[in-house]
Amino acid sequence: MLAGMEPNPADPSLHVPGALVPHDMAIPSYLRRAYSWAYLDPRTLRWLDRPGVVSAILWGNANRLMRDAVAEFAPGQRVLQAACVYGGFSVLLAQRVGARGALDVVDVAALQVANARGKLAGFRQAKVSQADLSVPGCVAAGAYDGVCCFFLLHEVPEAERCRIIDNLLAAVRPGGRIVFVDYHRPCRWHPLRPVMSLVFRSLEPYAQSLFGAAIESRSARSAGFEWTKTTCFGGLYQKLVGTRQG
């Protein structure tokens, strides 16, 4: 790139050509059934998409968790963000990859796509698309330097969860990295354990099933990655980082 020239978001060298494979798409029934109030209603979106609300939902850990996830990526990388996120996460990730990088944000809900586009309007390196990441082959193999899945897996049923994980692992190029940040089974002594059990039963119907097995065990592709897992806040949250070998 010549000095003084700004990156062009339409430039195919910035966003990966054909990284998102076209497919038939509809709002999944599980999303309508369990999360219409949170992700498909513009009235609640305006209330939920506030830094203070996001911080409260994560018991004051939102900024810490976002920073820790974003720090796993580097300027100039092509990164896929799986699902839109309330709060400032996408902006932080766009800032991290910088003007010479590219951020593709993907969500199945048109409302969330429109909302994220508004947040990222000032970042020419960012692109937001509508796609269902549980559709096999929806992302081209090896298309990204990095993939980030921030608090998505606990919101999908097990079958869809396994397909999403498999698709995201396939999207990482050799030497690239994938980062999962999500809930984790808290320590027995955790004072919030009873509260979170109630939250999961009443508001997050698929969360408990996430704890039944390690995230990486849900795809055979994980054998091609080196994994590091850390937990924080008494084990309530986890960060799983995989680096693809080869």
What are these regions (language model features)?
Residues A56-G76, G88, L92:
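Conserved alpha-helix/loop element of class I SAM-dependent methyltransferases that forms part
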Residues G98, V156-P157, V172-P174:
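Helix-to-beta-strand junctions that scaffold the AdoMet/dcAdoMet cofactor pocket
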Residues D145-A159:
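A short SAM/SAH-binding and catalytic strip from SAM-dependent methyltransferases
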Residues C162-P174:
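A short glycine-rich, Lys/Arg-flanked "PGG" loop and its adjoining helix->strand segment in the class I
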Residues V179-A223, W227-L236:
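C-terminal alpha-helical "lid/dimerization" subdomain adjacent to the S-adenosyl-L-methionine
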